[in-house]
Design a protein with these regions (language model features):
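Bacterial N-terminal signal peptides that target proteins for export
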Residues: 1-8
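Bacterial Sec-dependent signal peptides at the C-terminal "C-region" and cleavage site
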Residues: 8-23
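Short alpha-helical segments enriched in small residues
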Residues: 19-175
Length: 175
């Protein structure tokens, strides 16, 4: 009997920790909704994954202003106003570019917060400095912009998923 209870209790606890209600986007959703604050995203290597995770939640229109998938250099320059000099000097996958992406989309959308990603999802395109799975993420707030480099392993889809989660978790930290 005790083994059955323990097994049932363990299964229940595991189901709670795996439950999608614990996803970071749901926690951010609640915080932004409660504070009546807004969010915008600018994504390169994550290709709209972050925007999709937020807009999949009922009530996202209360805080989600826009998502820009800036995959090409032209889009980064024309829509997000990333400096040509910054891209030429540091490259598209850099702390400087992701910072400008987050600040640019926050400014353009007049949002309280913004998240941005740029990186190499793979399976090709890596360099010695930035191997496949290297992703710069940034969160821009009214007070500061925070950046972080992650190294996500696995397949292209795994890199995209991990980078999206890391970006949302960084946003949650900054809230």
């Amino acid at each position: 009997m005790n083994k059955i209870l323990l097994s049932t209790a363990t299964a229940f606890i595991l189901s709670l920790t795996a439950c999608s209600s614990h996803a970071p986007e749901k926690r951010v959703h609640r915080i932004l909704t409660d504070r009546i604050q807004t969010l915008a995203v600018a994504e390169s290597c994550t290709g709209g994954t972050i925007a999709a995770r937020f807009t999949a939640l009922p009530g996202a229109s209360a805080y989600f202003k826009c998502g820009v998938v800036a995959y090409s250099l032209d889009t980064k320059q024309e829509i997000l106003q990333i400096s040509c000099d910054t891209i030429a000097r540091y490259g598209a996958v850099s702390e400087q570019v992701v910072r400008q992406m987050a600040e640019g989309v926050r400014r353009a959308s007049n949002s309280h917060y913004a998240v941005a990603t740029t990186g190499i999802a793979g399976p090709t395109g890596g360099t010695p400095e930035y191997p496949v799975g290297s992703v710069w993420i940034a969160v821009s707030t009214p007070l500061r912009t925070t950046t972080r480099l992650i190294r996500a392993g696995g397949s292209r889809n795994a890199v995209i998923r991990k980078a999206g989660t890391a970006a949302i978790e960084l946003l949650e930290e900054e809230l």
